[in-house]
Every structure is written in C-alpha cells, then in structure tokens.
C-alpha cells in the first residue's frame, strides 16, 4: 500500500490522535504545583516561628512582622464577629499597615492589645500550590485570658510565595475555630 493512497483527512486524524494525549499531559503538568524542597519547607516553617516572635514583641517597631509579608501582603480577619460576618475583612495591606497591625509603625508599640501573650503556631501543614505554597496552622495563645491561660484561638490560612528575599507570606487569614473549611475539623467556637 502506497502512502499516496491515504486520504489527507485520515493522516490528519491520525496525527490528532497522537498529539491530543501529548497536549493533555503537557497541560496537566503545567497546572500541577511544583514540588517543594526540604529547604523550602524549613524556610516556610521559619515564617511561622518568626511571626510569633515578631507579633509577641513588636520588634523593630512592628517592621519585623511586616517584613514577613510580601510588599503587597495582606492580613485578613475571619475571627472577629465583624470579620466573620463579612466572610473575611482585610485589616492590613502592605508594609506600613502591617507594621501598625502588629502594634508598631505610627502606633509605636505603646498599646499592643496582646501584650503579655505568647502566640504558638502548631501543626503547620504546607502543601505546594501553583505559584507558591499554601499553609494552615493552629494558633494557640498563652496569657490571652490572664496569666497561664491557654486557648486555641482559631488558626491561620496562608499563601506563601518565594521572593528575592526568600519565602514570604502573600496572604494570611486568621480564621476562627468553627470556620475551618473541613467540617470534620470544626470545633465549638470559643472566640
């Protein structure tokens, strides 16, 4: 059988049958999140540790806290009654607002509402995601209801990106206990 006996439409169909699966595999690979290295996990985990120290101490007038975020980073409230009712309320965006959110910046660390508290970040889960990584971590506070009190105070849901300065928080949402997205993980609202 000569090649000239095949109709051009049959050749085109055969080529499409070969090309379509290859295109699908390529597209699927592009949509999946890249793997994170062990160093990525350590550096992202350090953000949670540095966050707790920066917020507890208002170090560097709140700018140590702000510098854990990207330049356009956001902190969203989904823990207060107002934030919960609005399904999230951006409380701070960008370095200056984030420094003030930590009690610093123009506020000068004078009346930090959580003075005497210790923020503990526990059970940090960091799955890779397109463009960076997601994070989910419980927040437990010591001292929020008086000396030696211990309370789960919801948690944080984050999106991290790798910048020239290393991993940074692009967005952090403080979520109250009953608002965690998996109903099996929801606990009575203590906030």
Role assignments for model-derived ranges:
Residues 55, 69-70, 77, 139-141, ...:
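Short beta-strand segments enriched in hydrophobic/aromatic residues
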Residues 27-67, 71:
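Short, low-complexity N-terminal intrinsically disordered segments enriched in polar/charged residues
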Residues 2-15:
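Bacterial N-terminal signal peptides that target proteins for export
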Residues 30-35, 109-191:
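A beta-strand edge to alpha-helix "cap/lid" segment located at domain peripheries
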Residues 13-23:
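Bacterial N-terminal signal peptides
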């Amino acid at each position: 059988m000569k090649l000239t006996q095949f109709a051009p439409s049959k050749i085109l169909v055969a080529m499409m049958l070969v090309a379509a699966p290859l295109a699908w595999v390529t597209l699927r690979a592009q949509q999946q999140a890249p793997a994170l290295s062990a160093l990525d996990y350590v550096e992202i985990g350090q953000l949670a540790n540095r966050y707790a120290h920066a917020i507890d101490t208002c170090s560097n007038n709140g700018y140590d806290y702000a510098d854990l975020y990207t330049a356009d980073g956001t902190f969203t409230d989904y823990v207060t009654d107002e934030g919960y009712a609005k399904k999230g309320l951006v409380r701070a965006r960008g370095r200056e607002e984030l420094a003030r959110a930590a009690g610093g910046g123009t506020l000068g660390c004078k009346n930090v509402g959580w003075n005497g508290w210790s923020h503990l970040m526990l059970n940090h889960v960091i799955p890779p995601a397109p463009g960076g990584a997601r994070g989910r971590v419980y927040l437990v506070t010591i001292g929020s209801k008086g000396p030696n009190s211990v309370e789960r105070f919801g948690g944080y849901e984050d999106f991290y990106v790798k910048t020239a300065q290393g991993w940074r928080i692009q967005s952090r949402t403080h979520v109250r206990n009953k608002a965690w997205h998996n109903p099996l993980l929801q606990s009575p609202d203590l906030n």
